[in-house]
Design a protein with these regions (language model features):
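Terminal targeting segments of Actinobacterial cell-envelope proteins
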Residues: 1-9
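An acidic, gly/pro-interrupted, aromatic-rich
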Residues: 610-611
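Catalytic-domain carbohydrate-binding cleft regions of carbohydrate-active enzymes
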Residues: 34-607, 618
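Secretory targeting and sorting signals
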Residues: 10-31
């Protein structure tokens, strides 16, 4: 049947549209039911219903499939309604820092700079993909603003600010199949180079200090794969963080940046810098971009600018304008090809002005969410032209479609605190929800970025280092104040970082296998327990632990002073990494967690060669 409504009588003015999705799929652990139809109801004084048939779904095996319909409304708004079954849980919607299960929340599908905010409604990288524990996913093909209201127990209400909304219903025999179908629709993630899943150290302060720190790390036997030098300025490309670091330390001196990078390459290290999509008045490139019309204007200004970083302002490159993109890509190619960088933090991308006038002719409300996608695509294309398959551009912002252009993600700017919404407690929800949504390669800022009450807290730094080491990328961040606790604070912190770096290095062959799988299938490296055990009702409730692939279970400690924590082990036999004890799963246990140990379990029979705990050289405690 046509996806346009069959008119039985001329209705009154249509104000919105609602889709009701009744019993889309069988509950994974319950009775199998075949859905009959998708119903579209106009909200107007005349009741008008049109039934749109779904593809046949076989209850016997719940086969994979995608059913697509386009919902249209005469108003600039489409509303969808999902009926919710008892016990049904929802996940996804991009990187989120609140509870992993989205039930009970009001969320916005709008890319925003969270800047350490505590609300879960906002996201650096939202995506309009909702996964249900009943065995289906719903992907909305739009960059318009969407509100997801999951506060009611019996329904989910979705409001999209658009007159036309393609809706993709994705089904499969298990959640993994649904995630794989979604990944193939939005774009499979590219495979990063091997070093991209390694141990990175953030270094600043100029050539001499960087080289001295590299020597110190080598003397401590830290297995280093890459250094990230974000204050290394390159005027030709505009790369580098051009402001004071930590409020007191100015950008370092790099008189021969290509020479320094070549020297670090000779020591087996990849070198990353820093880029963003902005042009800053008074700095190189701004006048040329303005004269050529590459910067986004608004009705009120020939070039839109907004305050940024101390006394500076920033303007946005128009990524909908092909010649502007080509000009910007020349700068990226210069940084990678001529200067020699191997990648960069791909920062920002969330703030494209909604009143901007874009070359594509699209309104800013449509361009806003698409901006980080275009930004990522442009950077990826330039990198591939110079160093195909050899670079990592690790991004903060994203939207549906940027998954295909990003070889690394960080979780944004957390506070140095134990806070569950803005500090260390927000990291795992961000990585898990982002992984469900199609971004598999996560490396959070070890110890966070913004100042907080934990800036001098060694225990907090240690717990963050442990979580970073058991992430796809182990990378630290120096933060936003002059002297936070860090790798070089004392002999104990250096030994802790070195020990967990050795553990991460031992995991690298396994992580690379998982990354190859992700690039082929879209399955994430960091996984909720229910992805491996969808028939286990307890697994669907666990939000504070995760699986690396199928064989490693990690239970981070994110509570100050905790020396033990409950851990749910899925079915099977599990080895406690620290004690060697073999534990039968499908049950809760109480795990010991002294300060220097993160609860860590390896599935019996896993093909992993991990170092003995005693060889890590961790401090006592």
């Amino acid at each position: 049947m046509s996806d346009r409504p069959r008119r039985r009588r001329r209705p009154a003015r249509v104000t919105a549209a609602v889709i009701v999705l009744p019993v889309l799929l069988a509950v994974l652990t319950g009775a199998r039911t075949v859905p009959a139809a998708m119903t579209w109801q106009h909200l107007n004084p005349v009741e008008l219903f049109t039934t749109i048939k779904l593809p046949a779904l076989q209850a016997s095996n719940r086969v994979s499939g995608v059913s697509t319909t386009v919902v249209r409304s005469t108003a600039q708004q489409v509303r969808l309604r999902l009926d919710v079954a008892p016990g049904e849980r929802f996940f996804g919607l991009g990187e989120r820092m609140g509870p992993l299960a989205l039930n009970g929340q009001l969320l916005h599908n709008w890319s925003e700079d969270r800047a350490g905010r505590a609300d879960a409604a906002t996201s650096y990288s939202p995506t309009p993909f909702l996964l249900s524990s009943r065995g289906y996913g719903l992907l909305l093909d739009t960059t318009a603003m969407i509100q997801y209201d999951l506060r009611r127990a019996d329904r989910v209400e979705i409001t999209a600010s658009t007159a036309e909304l393609p809706v993709h219903l994705i089904t499969g025999p298990d959640p993994a199949a649904v995630l794989q179908s979604h990944a193939k629709m939005v774009g499979l993630p590219p495979l990063p180079p091997r070093w991209g899943l390694g141990v990175w150290k953030c270094l600043i302060g100029g050539r001499d200090r960087v080289l001295a720190d590299v020597r110190r790390l080598a003397e401590a036997n830290v297995p280093l794969d890459a250094v990230w030098i974000y204050d290394a300025m390159d005027n030709g490309s505009g790369w580098g963080w051009p402001w004071q670091i930590h409020g007191t330390v100015p950008p370092g001196s790099y008189p021969d940046l290509p020479g320094l990078i070549e020297q670090l390459h000779g020591e087996g290290l990849a070198v990353l810098g820093y880029l963003n999509p902005f042009l800053v008045p008074g700095r190189r490139g701004f006048d040329e971009a303005r004269e050529r019309g590459y910067l986004v204007p608004t009705p009120a200004a020939p070039v839109f600018t907004e305050p940024w970083a101390e006394d500076d302002h920033r303007a946005y490159l128009d990524f909908t304008r092909p010649d502007a993109v080509a000009w910007w890509q020349d700068r990226v190619r210069h940084a990678l090809g001529t200067v020699g960088f191997d990648g960069a933090m791909q920062d920002y991308g969330e703030g494209a002005p909604v009143d901007g006038i874009y070359a594509s002719g699209q309104p800013g409300t449509v361009v806003h969410n698409a901006y980080p996608v275009r930004y990522a695509e442009a950077a990826r294309q330039a990198a591939q032209a110079v160093k195909p398959g050899q670079t990592v551009l690790f991004a903060r912002a994203g939207y549906s479609g940027s998954q295909a252009s990003v070889t690394g993600r960080f979780t944004g700017d957390q506070h140095r605190s134990w806070d569950r919404h803005t500090g260390i407690g927000s990291v795992l929800p961000a990585m898990l929800s982002g992984s469900i949504s199609g971004w598999p390669y996560w490396g959070p800022d070890i110890a966070g970025f913004f100042d907080g009450d934990g800036s001098r807290d060694v225990e907090l730094w240690t717990r963050w280092t442990q979580l970073g080491a058991l992430s796809p990328v182990m990378r630290d961040m120096l933060g936003a104040q002059a002297d936070p606790i860090g790798v070089f604070s004392n002999d104990g912190t250096l030994a802790t970082f070195a020990g967990y770096a050795r553990l991460h290095q031992a995991l690298m062959p396994y992580l690379h296998e998982l990354a190859e799988q992700a690039s082929r299938t879209g399955l994430p490296l960091i996984r909720p327990l229910w992805l491996a055990e969808p028939a286990d009702p307890v697994a669907w409730t666990v939000e504070d632990a995760y699986l690396l692939g199928e064989d490693v279970l990690v239970a981070p400690v994110v509570t100050e002073g905790a020396r033990s924590r409950p851990v749910y082990l899925p079915a099977g036999q599990w080895h406690d990494y620290w004690t060697g004890e073999v534990i039968t799963g499908a049950r809760w246990i109480s795990a010991r967690a002294p300060v220097q140990q993160i609860p860590l379990y390896v599935r019996t029979g896993a093909n992993l060669a991990l170092p003995l705990p005693a060889t890590l050289g961790l401090p006592a405690g």
